[in-house]
């Protein structure tokens, strides 16, 4: 019996694997899956996964009901797929404007380089000095009954400033949501109110048309038409030889893409654009993106605020989707003239490519921590946004940073980068960058650069895409001009009167451009003593102060920003309503970049310019009116130029208040100077202690090299080049002699020191030989 039981067990064991090894065929699958027993125990997770993976049973008889059920299931699957493909797309009819959820680009440095959280150096508390002197409290020249609300707003702002001085870090981290709500409210509901306010101002202030402004300027500055000089333009033959065929550019302009999907971009890029609220490409974007994706060189120009940064950043990110995954190298370099513009471009790229895997950005700008940038560049990021000087420094002195595998070079604000100020640095960068198989993209709002300047870039038949004329302002910009005549001393009071007339409940951002850094600082002190919160932005500030000023202005903690031409190019701070030219710029191109800070991306804006008596000021006004009249002939929606009338009696009364505070202004400047000297002494003391403690480590570091010596730096400017010969300084006498030799004219002989000495050494006669 035992033997029989063993045999039966063996048979059962032989039968079990035969059932396990049973393989399903297509026919058996259709017969039914439930007939096959599951002999192994499964976990709940495996059962759920298998239930999801199980195909639905297909019955043999085909009926109409089953067909209907299949159609319903297919429709459900299609809707699910569409939801998965486009989860965050929002369609609007506002062109290429950003949605209300997007509040502009960030001007902060990430991770270890976050200078907003850990300031490297201490700064002088100028607002504290102004409060001790009686400023930043009550707005000068305002009635208490009328402006009770304004005084309440100002008192709240003063309390916020005191809290900011106690804890800057908590303010920057905790108030972001409140600022977003304020900006969203302004963007959604305040447009009609601001338009009505503008209409009320227009009714109160009589304005002249373009012809009236031009006639007034002609009366004030007669005979200046003869001084206008026409610039030398490139011939048609030279342009045909240098640029690609014009048909390619014209066809690109005609192809107006209504959506970004028609540009055949990848899904991660489209998702990033939808996250920013971009639905319709701008004309410069629809024209340049297809050409850039083909790998061709581009020389492009469009008005300010037309989306030029995204026009070159979108095809770059699309191209980097197909890079080798295992090889990390820097493939793209973007050059920008200012640090703030480079930080903004870096944020634009990060937000467009936020859904792209393995896409890294690097930032190399001056004023920030050099060692942290070296550590970031060691990882060899795909895209490096840099200013020219710091890029050369890293190429020469950072050991693990190389640009041998560079594929794309972008020069933003190309006309400024090709000027003589960046000439030496740009030629050095071009000598270090490989020329073979390099794509070069040039973008600017005033791209009127000559071919002679572009030859050094070694472009390969670039496509010239000019969406707008090189000297044209935005369509919805209203340009106002105030004739100062002989009232230059009233300009600070006039500026205060204009800013005070703006309704504070509208949360307007106002940018004031000045010519000199000293005047920007002094205006901040004057307006602060008059009770107005103002920030400044210029080259004398540290990089931490510059970024803090931009962030405070962006977050509306400070509504007025006084700056030099440092902020005239590229900065895209949303909802800047008014630009005031306190000092006239040197050229019409700089004027266009200044007024281009407002009326961006199809919005409305206003510029107010103080016009002096010089012929240069009059020429800029004439060019502005001329460009408007030319555009009005082409496009009826073009902006207008008007002459603004001012109540000079009120300005003179305000000027008396300003003059009464002259001694206080000097006291503030002296106190600030003493505080700066104390901080400088503390810095020198800490520097000396570090030199004593870490002497060996500091001396062991290799010296950083530069492509120019100190003497070469001094002889860079035009004036020094004219006054020098072969690197040596030439005095006035030698320079005059050289000029005379060039003119081939005779010059009267002048006794030298040797001649005078030889006359003195001659012996005097004793008179013996006299008869």
From Swiss-Prot:
Residue stretches in coiled coil: 33-84
Function: ATP-binding RNA helicase involved in ribosome assembly.
Subunit structure: Associates with pre-ribosomal particles.
Domain Helicase ATP-binding: 289-465
Organism, scientific name: Debaryomyces hansenii (strain ATCC 36239 / CBS 767 / BCRC 21394 / JCM 1990 / NBRC 0083 / IGC 2968)
Keywords: ATP-binding, Coiled coil, Helicase, Hydrolase, Nucleotide-binding, Nucleus, Ribosome biogenesis, RNA-binding
DEAD box, short sequence motif: residues: 412-415
Lineage: Eukaryota, Fungi, Dikarya, Ascomycota, Saccharomycotina
Comp. bias intervals (Basic and acidic residues): 47-56, 69-79, 695-717
GO biological process: rRNA processing
Motif (Q motif): 258-286
InterPro entries: DEAD/DEAH_box_helicase_dom (IPR011545), DEAD_box_RNA_helicase (IPR050079), Helicase_ATP-bd (IPR014001), Helicase_C-like (IPR001650), P-loop_NTPase (IPR027417), RNA-helicase_DEAD-box_CS (IPR000629), RNA_helicase_DEAD_Q_motif (IPR014014)
Gene3D superfamilies attached to this UniProt entry: P-loop containing nucleotide triphosphate hydrolases
Protein name: ATP-dependent RNA helicase DRS1
Segments of this protein annotated with the region Disordered: 1-96, 109-128, 134-233, 695-771
Domain commentary: The Q motif is unique to and characteristic of the DEAD box family of RNA helicases and controls ATP binding and hydrolysis.
Comp. bias intervals (Polar residues): 85-96
GO molecular function: ATP binding; ATP hydrolysis activity; RNA binding; RNA helicase activity
Family designation: Belongs to the DEAD box helicase family. DDX27/DRS1 subfamily.
Keyword Nucleus belongs to the record: yes
GO cellular component, as recorded: cytosol; nucleolus
Helicase C-terminal domain ranges (all copies): 476-643
Comp. bias regions, Acidic residues: 28-46, 149-182, 197-233
EC number: 3.6.4.13
């Amino acid at each position: 019996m035992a033997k029989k039981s063993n045999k039966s067990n063996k048979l059962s064991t032989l039968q079990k694997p035969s059932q396990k090894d049973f393989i399903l065929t297509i026919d058996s699958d259709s017969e039914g899956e439930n007939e096959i027993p599951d002999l192994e125990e499964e976990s709940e997770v495996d059962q759920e996964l298998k239930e999801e993976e199980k195909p639905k049973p297909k019955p043999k008889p085909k009926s109409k009901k089953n067909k209907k059920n299949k159609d319903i299931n297919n429709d459900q699957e299609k809707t699910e797929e569409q939801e998965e493909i486009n989860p965050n797309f929002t369609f609007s009819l506002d062109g290429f404007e950003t949605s209300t959820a997007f509040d502009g680009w960030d001007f902060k440095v990430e991770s270890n380089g976050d200078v907003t959280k850990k300031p490297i150096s201490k700064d002088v508390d100028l607002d504290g000095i102004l409060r001790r002197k009686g400023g930043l409290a009550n707005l000068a020249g305002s009635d208490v009954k009328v402006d009770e609300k304004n005084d309440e707003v100002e008192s709240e702002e003063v309390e916020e400033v005191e809290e900011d001085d106690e804890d800057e870090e908590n303010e920057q981290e905790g108030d972001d949501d409140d600022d977003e709500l304020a900006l969203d409210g302004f963007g959604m509901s305040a447009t009609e109110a601001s338009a009505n306010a503008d209409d009320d101002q227009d009714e109160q202030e009589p304005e002249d048309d373009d012809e009236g402004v031009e006639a007034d300027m002609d009366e004030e500055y007669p005979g200046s038409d003869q001084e206008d000089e026409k610039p030398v333009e490139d011939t048609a033959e030279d342009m045909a030889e240098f640029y690609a065929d014009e048909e390619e550019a014209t066809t690109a302009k005609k192809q107006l893409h209504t959506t970004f999907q028609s540009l055949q971009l990848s899904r991660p890029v489209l998702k990033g654009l939808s996250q920013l609220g971009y639905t319709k490409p701008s004309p410069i974007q629809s024209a340049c993106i297809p050409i850039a994706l083909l790998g061709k060189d581009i020389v492009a120009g469009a008005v300010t605020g037309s989306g030029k940064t995204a026009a070159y950043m979108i095809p770059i990110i699309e191209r980097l989707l197909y890079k080798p995954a295992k090889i990390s190298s820097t493939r793209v370099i973007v050059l920008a003239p200012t640090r703030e513009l480079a930080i903004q471009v870096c944020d634009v790229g990060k937000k467009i490519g936020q859904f792209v895997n393995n896409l890294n950005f690097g930032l190399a700008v001056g004023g920030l921590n050099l060692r942290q940038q070296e550590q970031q560049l060691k990882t060899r990021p795909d895209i490096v946004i840099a200013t020219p000087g710091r890029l050369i420094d890293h190429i020469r002195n950072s050991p693990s940073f190389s640009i041998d595998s560079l594929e794309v070079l972008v020069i933003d604000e190309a006309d400024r980068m090709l000027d003589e100020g960046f000439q030496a640095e740009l030629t050095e960068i071009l000598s270090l960058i490989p020329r073979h198989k390099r794509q070069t993209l040039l973008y600017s709002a005033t791209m009127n650069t000559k071919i002679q300047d572009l030859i050094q870039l070694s472009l390969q038949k670039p496509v010239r895409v000019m969406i707008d004329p090189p000297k044209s302002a935005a369509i919805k910009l209203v340009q106002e001009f105030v004739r100062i005549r002989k009232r230059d001393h009233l300009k600070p009071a006039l500026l205060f009167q204009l800013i005070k007339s703006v309704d504070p409940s509208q949360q307007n951002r106002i940018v004031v451009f000045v010519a000199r850094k000293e005047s920007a600082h002094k205006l901040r002190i004057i307006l602060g003593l008059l009770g107005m919160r103002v920030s400044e932005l210029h080259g004398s500030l540290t990089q931490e102060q510059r970024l803090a000023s931009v962030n405070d202005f962006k977050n509306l903690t400070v509504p007025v920003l006084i700056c030099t031409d440092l902020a005239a190019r590229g900065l895209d701070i949303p909802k800047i309503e008014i630009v005031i030219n306190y000092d006239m710029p040197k050229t019409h191109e700089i004027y266009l970049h200044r007024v281009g800070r407002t009326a961006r991306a199809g919005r409305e804006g206003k510029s107010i310019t103080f016009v002096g008596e010089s012929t240069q000021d009059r020429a800029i006004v004439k060019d502005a009116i001329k460009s408007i009249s030319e555009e009005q002939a082409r496009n009826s929606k073009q902006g207008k130029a008007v002459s603004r009338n001012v109540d000079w009696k009120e300005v003179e009364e305000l000027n008396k208040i300003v003059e009464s505070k002259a001694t206080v202004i000097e006291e503030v400047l002296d106190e600030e100077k003493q505080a700066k000297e104390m901080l400088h002494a503390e810095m020198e003391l800490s520097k000396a202690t570090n030199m004593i403690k870490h002497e060996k480590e500091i001396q062991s570091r290799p010296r950083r090299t530069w492509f120019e010596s100190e003497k070469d730096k001094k002889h860079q400017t035009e004036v020094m080049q004219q006054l020098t010969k072969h690197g040596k300084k030439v005095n006035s006498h030698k320079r005059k002699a050289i000029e005379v030799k060039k003119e081939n004219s005779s010059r009267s002989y002048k006794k030298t020191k040797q001649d005078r000495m030889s006359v003195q050494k001659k012996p005097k006669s004793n008179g013996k030989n006299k008869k």
